[in-house]
């Protein structure tokens, strides 16, 4: 005997299925479920009178043969697709994406549930991979709380605290500081990787930082990003399979953008601040988007272009780069970096996939908890102003959604050599997952899972009789306590450091994972974000032309995912 359910009734019970559409928060973005891995009539759901009970949806198999945790009936949004499925987690990793249940009595089961299995109800929820922020100034450890609660589960950057150097540059300089920061990483329930200072004209000062545990090196103009420093840094990176991130020369003191590109010599590099106002060669740093060896990212303070963007930036810049507004030269330096035309073009270059990544620039002009919000605000603004992307139709924005989610998940992972562990929802990867109610998508996660265990969740009064009474806010869960912390989060290091035995030497508790493949990744590998246009920026008007087309758009006066979500 079968019962035919209406689409509405089915969605309310088991979540959306193939062909159903979901609005992302209060944006104009709609995603459509492309495939449903669960079988109609054989869905599993936990609760009183539901399916996951002994002898029904729960099998008699031992712990070794069943999932540790199953997220049931979730909608997965990732660079590779938008699907409905059950997600299995085993030993802290994603074990399978498919159909959960009892293989003894149910057809099509690819994920076995047993007495050893915990259930997280994913009905009606969207699941994304944990975000990766690759532009972190480690100024204050409290940034980690903000980032984690926003859905970011991996942070890459540099610094030592609120030192003047760290306030301006993302560098953890030298072996002593590197050791201290790696020891500090043991205390935080998030994946971390640190960049050493790359500004040196001889190899030894750089190699010793890689040996100490740096996953890469950061070249910053405030330390002198000369062609000699660039060439030396990239040579060391090639020898150690680590990445180089660069903040180029705003003042064009050591050469123009062409001189910097020439110093790259075709070698892979992650260009920070490939944007309209964040820094780097003024006014034409955007030109590097067209280089095959350049992996470009921009930061969130200019995301998206709004009526308030320009006014906000001048004061931020003066503080972050230790400038004095009473000195004419300092003021001119700041004003040269803030250009409405290039900021507007940045929106469009993101939408067309020329800019491959988006990050925060935390407490150094960017907001660490707003990478995900501002990514989707940019996607919304571009849909409203530019319409559907090629590949999307009238029914959904699936391609645009895949393009934008890739900017803070898989592409940063590929760039920094950690995609074998994180960056997407795929079997074998570390189970860093973010669960969202669609109405709060991109703004306020319902739950953040780290290494297969719940790390942060919205939780009500701990003294209440049920979990939901007010005040409901983000609270750290058991994955952040005791020995579980070190077993549910990772610290990324170089292979050179791992071979040198820094784990034992520094007394580290977290698992150390080496980065790999940093030197072979190219712009072509940036998923859904690999466009290499020929860009020209007019030195007088700052107009941006890409492949012959003028890139311009109006600033937004109103944005979604904003004040209505943050009244309290």
Curated annotation (Swiss-Prot):
Q: Which Gene Ontology molecular-function terms are recorded?
A: nickel cation binding; urease activity
Annotated active site: 321
Residue ranges of domain Urease in the record: 130-568
Q: Which domain of life is it from?
A: Bacteria
Residues bearing N6-carboxylysine are 218
Q: Which UniProt keywords apply?
A: Cytoplasm, Hydrolase, Metal-binding, Nickel
Enzyme class, UniProt record, top EC level: hydrolase
What span is annotated as the signal peptide, if there is one? none
Q: What is its main location?
A: cytoplasm
SUPFAM superfamilies for this protein: Composite domain of metallo-dependent hydrolases, Metallo-dependent hydrolases
Annotated Ni(2+) 2 binding sites? 218, 247, 273
Query: Residues that bind substrate, according to the entry?
Result: 220
Modification after translation (UniProt): Carboxylation allows a single lysine to coordinate two nickel ions.
Residues reported in the UniProt entry to bind Ni(2+) 1: 135, 137, 218, 361
Localized where?
A: Cytoplasm
Assembly with partners or alone: Heterotrimer of UreA (gamma), UreB (beta) and UreC (alpha) subunits. Three heterotrimers associate to form the active enzyme.
Listed name of the protein: Urease subunit alpha
Organism equals Burkholderia pseudomallei (strain K96243)
Q: Which gene encodes it?
A: ureC
């Amino acid at each position: 005997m079968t019962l035919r359910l209406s689409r509405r009734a089915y969605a309310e019970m088991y979540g959306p299925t193939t062909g159903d559409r979901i609005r992302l928060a209060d944006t104009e973005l709609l995603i459509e479920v492309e495939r449903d891995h669960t079988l109609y009539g054989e869905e599993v759901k936990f609760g009183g009178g539901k399916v996951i009970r002994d002898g029904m949806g729960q099998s008699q198999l031992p712990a070794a043969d069943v999932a540790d945790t199953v997220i049931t009936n979730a909608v997965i949004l990732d660079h590779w697709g938008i699907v409905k499925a059950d997600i299995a987690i085993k030993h802290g990793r994603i074990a399978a994406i498919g159909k959960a249940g009892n293989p003894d009595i149910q057809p099509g089961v690819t994920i076995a549930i047993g007495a050893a299995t915990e259930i997280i109800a994913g009905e009606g929820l969207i699941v994304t991979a944990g975000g990766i922020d690759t532009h972190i100034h480690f100024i204050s450890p409290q940034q980690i709380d903000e980032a984690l609660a926003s859905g970011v589960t991996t942070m890459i950057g540099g610094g030592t605290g609120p030192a003047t150097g760290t306030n301006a540059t993302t560098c953890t300089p030298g072996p002593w500081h590197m050791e201290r920061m790696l020891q500090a990483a043991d205390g935080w329930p998030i994946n971390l990787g640190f960049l050493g200072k790359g500004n040196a004209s001889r190899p030894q000062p750089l190699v010793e930082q890689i040996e100490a545990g740096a996953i890469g090196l950061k070249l910053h103009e405030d330390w002198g990003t000369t062609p000699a420093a660039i060439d030396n840094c990239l040579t060391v990176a090639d020898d150690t399979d680590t990445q180089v991130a660069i903040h180029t020369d705003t003042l064009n003191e050591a050469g123009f953008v062409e001189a910097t590109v020439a110093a790259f010599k075709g070698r892979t590099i992650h260009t920070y601040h490939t944007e309209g106002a964040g820094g780097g060669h003024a006014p034409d740093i955007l030109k590097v988007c067209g280089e095959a060896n350049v992996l470009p990212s921009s930061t969130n303070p200019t995301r998206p272009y709004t009526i308030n963007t320009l006014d906000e930036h001048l004061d931020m810049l003066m503080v972050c780069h230790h400038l004095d507004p009473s000195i004419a030269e300092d003021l001119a330096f700041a004003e040269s970096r803030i250009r409405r035309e290039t900021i507007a073009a940045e929106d469009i270059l993101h939408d067309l996939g020329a800019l491959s990544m988006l990050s925060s620039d935390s407490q150094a002009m960017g907001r660490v908890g707003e990478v995900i919000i501002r990514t989707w605000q940019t996607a919304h603004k571009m849909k409203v102003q530019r319409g559907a992307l090629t590949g999307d139709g009238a029914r959904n924005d699936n391609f645009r959604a895949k393009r934008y989610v890739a900017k803070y998940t898989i592409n940063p992972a590929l760039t920094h050599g950690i995609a074998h562990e994180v960056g997407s929802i795929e079997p074998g990867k570390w189970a860093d997952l973010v669960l969202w109610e669609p109405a709060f998508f991109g703004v306020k996660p319902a739950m953040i899972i780290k290494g297969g265990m719940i790390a942060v969740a919205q939780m009500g009064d701990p003294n209440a009789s049920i979990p939901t009474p007010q005040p409901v806010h983000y609270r750290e869960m058991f994955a952040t306590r005791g020995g579980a912390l070190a077993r549910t989060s990772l610290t990324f290091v170089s292979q050179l450091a791992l071979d040198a035995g820094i784990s034992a030497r520094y007394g580290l508790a977290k698992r150390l994972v080496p980065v790999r493949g940093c030197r072979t990744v190219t712009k072509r590998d940036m998923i859904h974000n690999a466009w290499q246009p020929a860009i020209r920026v007019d030195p007088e008007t700052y107009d941006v032309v890409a492949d012959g087309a003028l890139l311009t758009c109006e600033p937004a006066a109103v944005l979604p995912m904003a004040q209505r979500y943050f009244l309290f």
